[in-house]
Amino acid sequence: MALAAAPGFSAAAPSLPDLDRNAVRRIGQAWRDSHPEATERTLSARLFPAGRGPEALPALRAAVAADFRAGRIFIHRGWRLSDTEGALFALLAMET
């Protein structure tokens, strides 16, 4: 699960030093190619409706699990990600 790479979201993406920004851009752009209507504002509202506080990660994990149960899958170069994970990569790519 892509969320395992991000232990918390209390700060913006640039403070995640271990993030492979090139990979984030590639995955985020691939997701955005199939969701051209997505904007930084809409993705932020979708992924972080209560802000990026301590409750954000459990909420994202629940959304990821719900995506997999519902078959909302995003496939990029053989990787099977939830739609929520794809959206998160897109948002991180926009913020970096």
Predicted segments with their positions:
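N-terminal export signals
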Residues: 1-13
